[in-house]
Amino acid sequence: RTGWAKLPNGRHIYNTGMQVIGDAGGIEVKLSDTLPQLELTDRCTEMEDKQVLQSYLRKLSREPDILILLVAHMVRSLLASMFERLGFPLRYILYLVGVQGSGKTTAANDFGLPFTDVTQNAPAPATRALSSKPAVRDFAAEYRDMSALLDDVCTSSSAETRRISTDIAAYTLRFAADRIYEAISRPGGGQRKVRCTAGLVITGEFPMQKPSDLTRCVIVEVDHQMRGKEADDRMVSSATATRFIKYLAEHFDSVSDEIRMALSNFRADAVEEGGPRQQQHMGELSCSFQLLLEYARSIGAIDDLEMAEWRLRLQNALGRALSANMCLTAKFERENVSNVAKIIVDAMKSET
């Protein structure tokens, strides 16, 4: 599988599918040729770690409410197996919702998908909206410890297309967030059970409409044309991810301890607003982005004052996402109550 592996000598390495990132300590690591053909490239080799991170953070400051959450989710997905081992499985989908042409897909590719599919020379893992539930299941279960994009899941074309896409999106949410195991056929016969192991990002033009679906999402509203794209966005993003993964591999146990301490002190059920489930999502995203900030500070890319400024930006981004989710949940709950009331009134009229 892609993702983290512990070697017999106690070291941890990250497998992209085609590469091993991290010091194996002299152990030869062979990768199966059946793995996804993904790689992570660092084309900023002439830049020091500090310079790469400073460039990266400057780019995030263009659209902090959107890009911070994409990056936090990318880090959360990279460390999915570590979080799960600590008792925090990934139980949400990051949903970028906004009008067509606002830059959702470009942002997701540049800042949420640092890997490249070498067979297509394209950001990966990513696919256009899938037309069947088995296709979604197979895609979401193929990748481990990385974010993956399902693009244009909910688009507003015909009413029938919208109904089908909403149904598939709802299935995707439950397959990912509820940790559902499903049986698939083996090539040689028999079956095996799979579940979602990727950190899914989906894009769409309209939000989910059931409160139970919304609680499985972290909503990122893209309500304007995103600005300031630069030609080297993806190059710097991939270089940052490469160096950050090397740092994580070297400090794997201490990072695990940081996550355990951060989330053991975080009590989602002690927070009144947004419900425990949403608060848990936000707590995990906050922890993930702060791991990146700690790395940036450790290499001198930011100082304590800048660290505090970035934490404030993070807080604002999380607050905006939580507010969007709460507003949508309240809206659809009101509509559901109104619809039920109308049905009761109509039924009473028909009896008289």
Give the location of each predicted region.
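The conserved Walker
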Residues: 100
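Glycine- and acidic
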Residues: 35-39, 49-65, 89-97, 151-158, ...
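AAA+/P-loop NTPase substrate/partner-engagement loops
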Residues: 97, 106-162
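Phosphate-binding P-loop
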Residues: 81-91
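Structural recognition of the conserved hydrophobic beta-strand(s) that form the central parallel beta-sheet
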Residues: 149-151, 182-183, 194-205, 219-221
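Extended, charged/polar low-complexity intrinsically disordered regions
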Residues: 1-60, 325
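Extended alpha-helical interface modules used as scaffolds for assembling large macromolecular complexes
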Residues: 1, 5-13, 18-23, 132-136, ...
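N-terminal pre-Walker A segment at the start of P-loop NTPase domains
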Residues: 62-82
